[in-house]
Amino acid sequence: MKIIKRSGAEVIYDRNKISTAIRKANGQVRESHRLKESQIESIVDDIEIECHNSGHALNVEDIQDLVENGIMQNGAYEVAKLYITYRYRHQLLRKENTTDQQIMSLLEENNEEVKQENSNKNPTVVSVQRDYMAGEVSKDITRRFLLDPDICKAHDEGIIHFHDADYFAQHMHNCDLVNLEDMLQNGTVISGTKIDRPHSFSTACNIATQIIAQVASCQYGGQSITLTHLAPFVDVSRKKIMAETTELIKATGLQVSSEQFDYMVEQRVKDEIKRGVQTIQYQVITLMTTNGQAPFVTVFMYLNEAKNEQEKADLALIIEEVLKQRYQGVKNEKGAWITPAFPKLIYVLENDNVEQGSPYYYLSELAAKCTARRMVPDYISEKKMLELKIDAKGNGNCYPCMGCRSFLTPYLDLTGKPKYYGRFNQGVVTLNLVDVACSSGGDMMKFNQLLQERLELCHRALRIRHERLLGTKSDAAPILWQNGALARLKKGEVIDKLLYNGYSTISLGYAGLCECVRYMTGKSHTDPDAKPFALNVMKALNEACKKWKEAEHIDYSVYGTPLESTTYKFAKCLKKRFGIIEGVTDKNYITNSYHVNVTEKIDAFTKLSFESEFQRLSPGGAVSYVEVPNMENNIPAVMALLKHIYNNIMYAELNTKSDFCQKCGYTGEIQIATDGDGKLIWECPNCKNHDQATMNVARRTCGYIGTQYWNQGRTQEIKERVLHL
């Protein structure tokens, strides 16, 4: 059995330390007020039982709370008073050096919480450690100077989650859609160097990767680009190749027919596309940003976004090459082909690629094969998105999410045209719906009252996020605000006008709708009797955002929070506050957003149809998924799922498993086992290897694919996922 020290290090539980601390306090009071030795042992026994039953490693503060409760329950109030005073004095001493222990533990690589915090960061790498060090300082400044005490308290108790405090000290935003078209067509500046319009597709791809890296270093959330912005440069290369080929033919005196000429040109164009796509794939996964990780970038593939038929045909060539290269994968250090985490791919299902016999159906088949092997692309239904994203003129719009799932709301620029690229999200605060339910004791009236109170708490926290960005000068991130990624502001100009009137969004996140409904109704939200309550909760969130937006002209929107590592924190806080409640707080995780619980048996088609109603009520972003077995030999079934997505839900993804053991060469599913301390570990089913450094494991955790492992809460959630097909 293990516990988590204040530094985050995981150590073996030692009952002697607890009994010694109690005896020290006990020895300082009058004999008549002292605990008996048998009482001390009983208190320690009870604590040990509580640690075993908790299902996760308790931290030192939890243990000390149990000690206080145990002493009080035995009526030794004088002893308790001394113990509490001792604890308080040490707390004051620690406040003098608020970050030292955390920073030292992550540098010494024994901080268990940091090791499992981010499934795309390797905490043993010095560049990642530098980012974590800066993050600890930022969190400390945020807590002590930037947040109200009650918001800090609510965050600590898992009532809300104030996201990305490790970057909040700086004036940084969350995620965005990069206006690659403006930067490539009109030129940009990167690190003080003027970059003109590229003269070939491969050069455009190379510049795009430099832009991606620069943007990633100036924000903490994900970014998205569209291949449509690269497509015009295919024809730029084509014309250049035609001129070169013509000169070569003239110089050699060869007799070439027009068909042969066209063939020669198109082969060279395809080679150019292959090189350009390869540049993006390998640059993205090998680049290291100032965040200590590869850029969190999404590549959008949408045929109907093209401006003309030539551009659409060229875009199809690029999409085909992207899918072929991702299907192949990338090699790990052992030379085995594996699934890369980035870039995330999104493929739009539309009327000319979803029906058999349609012009681009072959691309959808290739996408299906790629998903079956590599878990991407994910899918957006143009049909459903046009129904849901209606602008002020009454027109539907189709556009990418920012990163993994955060969606902008429809917006028309000053000329009355829809605008999406160049817009961004200001940040997220998430409400723990499970805590609202448990705090109400099951009383509907009290639930509604508490929900409104907690929403107002989130509102205040979101205002703090918004106000942190107010007054930010464009000089803070020239690539974003001055050189086209998001805007073309002047030097020294503030970004304030981009924070209002719908240009950017700010997100009210929510988590645990499933457990919230189960506590309040005794049933899953998939049950027809419980579903109306679940929908009413979602409507209440949207009504709050609408009210705030109308009053402040800030675009608040409801967001289905992915909770990568926070799921574990919320679960631990719920157990501490309410104990273990079957079906509600009995796991080390809570369910993401509106999702059906991972253990509930439901088929893929029913799950997607059911969740589509809730996705509609998460306009600020959400994604649904289905868990499927190895589908590489059943592509028709994947195609059936894609058609169902097209007709029923705006945004969805398929989760498969594609792992590799470097010790024995096993390819398949690396499994989750339990060690002697009850801790979940990864295990090769072939050679029983437990060394995470010698396994390549890829799992979807929050819209992105994670490859650096997860905390105990998320690992339990991954283990308990049932197949939907």
Residue ranges of predicted features:
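Short, solvent-exposed positions on alpha-helices
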Residues: 38, 57-61, 504, 528, ...
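Contiguous, well-ordered alpha-helical segments that form the cores/surfaces of helical PPI scaffolds
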Residues: 232, 506-519, 539, 700
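Metallocofactor- and cofactor-centric catalytic cores in central/energy metabolism, strongly enriched
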Residues: 273, 281, 519, 714-719
